[in-house]
Amino acid sequence: MVSWIHFLSQMADEPVLWDLKKIAEIAYRAESLEFNEPGGMMDQYTTSIGGFIHLESQPSIKIEKINAKLGTFILGDSLEPKDTMRVLFRCKDSRLELMKKLEFRNPGIDFKSCSSNHDLTNLDNDEKELYFGTIKNKEILNEALLELNKDKIDHKIIGELLNDHHSVLRDILQISTEKIENMLEAALNAGAYGGKINGSGGGGCMFAYAPDNPEKVAEAIKNAGGETYLIHSDIGTQIEK
């Protein structure tokens, strides 16, 4: 969709010179908003801009380019269908309701400001677990940003942070599957530094971070029943002349 929009913008009777952020915005509107479909905007912005990015969507779109050289990832397709609506209810809708509930005792609280210091007395145990999982994910993100912006990245730390993030997705948000777990375990045993389920979860794909011996890790994921693709960071959409 991103490349198609870029192409059409140049082939129009009156071509427009949209920047990469504008192309990403239109792709997101076409894929999600137009059809009232759930989902984030990271795919469209990453595809358009290229490389590694950090995207903040609130209060407005803010994008930070990350010039990290991480090497090879292996995308593993479990071939399992995804139950996106069920997953998003747990991951998105439930957490939005959680923030509304917390607002009563914690005026102004949001996903960016939430911490363990807020008043949680009106939450039940399941809601508290979901809340602390949200905080943990935020902490993992901040640790990863610090590491990725270093001149010399510790690739094993990046792998460990991916594992930590997956633990939250599996144990608290409950979006992993038995097959995905088997594929991740096989990847780690074969030498991957880390990995996690990809996208909304509930099936679909996982990825493993394996800058060393990626072919060995890919073979292990195949043996666990997945289809594999070796992937690297690349440039975004562009017009070749």
Task: Please place each PLM-identified region on the residue numbering.
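Short alpha-helical patches at coil-to-helix transitions and adjacent helical residues
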Residues: 1-2, 20, 39, 177
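Broad gene-expression machinery/nucleic-acid interaction feature
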Residues: 41, 73, 205
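Short Gly/Ser/Thr- and Asp/Glu-enriched loop/turn motifs at secondary-structure junctions
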Residues: 199-203
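Alpha/beta catalytic cores of group-transfer enzymes, especially the acyltransferase/condensing modules
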Residues: 12-67, 195-198
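DPxDG-like acidic metal-binding loop motif
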Residues: 1-15
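C-terminal nucleotide
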Residues: 25, 46, 54-194, 208-241
